[in-house]
Amino acid sequence: MTPLVVLAVAIAGGLGAVARLVLDGVLRSRAPVSFPLGTTAINVTGSFVLGLVTALALGHGLPPEWRAILGTGFIGGYTTFSTASYEAVRLAQQRQYRAALLTGVGMMFLALGAAGLGLWLGGLAVAPTPPAPSTTL
């Protein structure tokens, strides 16, 4: 891996983190609830985008450098499963057990489903289209 790729991954990670900060701030201001809606939305959308990027990369042979920049860099900076874990523990400590369980387990299933959906849709986008039937004999 070249120094330029490492720099690009770092920049993309910073941009992903800024996108996370902005989206989380917008969601917190619009829906002031104890449930971590922003973190959930970020992790689910990030998982979807990573699934989509992965399928598109595999189907189009995206170079490994670009996979690192987009997946490890941007999406890695954007998603935040450590914050989700912290928020689940925080909710449990506050005796909000249902919200803690929903945050911990629910986010995992939602993120896995979103990643699978992204992989599937990305696979459809790169799947070869069958040739049209011939109308001539």
From Swiss-Prot:
The keyword Hydrolase does not apply. Belongs to the fluoride channel Fluc/FEX (TC 1.A.43) family. The chain crosses the membrane at residues 3-23, 42-62, 69-89, 107-127. Keywords: Cell membrane, Ion channel, Ion transport, Membrane, Metal-binding, Sodium, Transmembrane, Transmembrane helix, Transport. This is Fluoride-specific ion channel FluC 1. Na(+) is not transported, but it plays an essential structural role and its presence is essential for fluoride channel function. It is a multi-pass membrane protein. One of its GO terms (biological process) is cellular detoxification of fluoride. One of its GO terms (cellular component) is plasma membrane. It comes from Leifsonia xyli subsp. xyli (strain CTCB07). Its main location: membrane. PANTHER family: FLUORIDE EXPORT PROTEIN 1-RELATED. It is found in: Cell membrane.
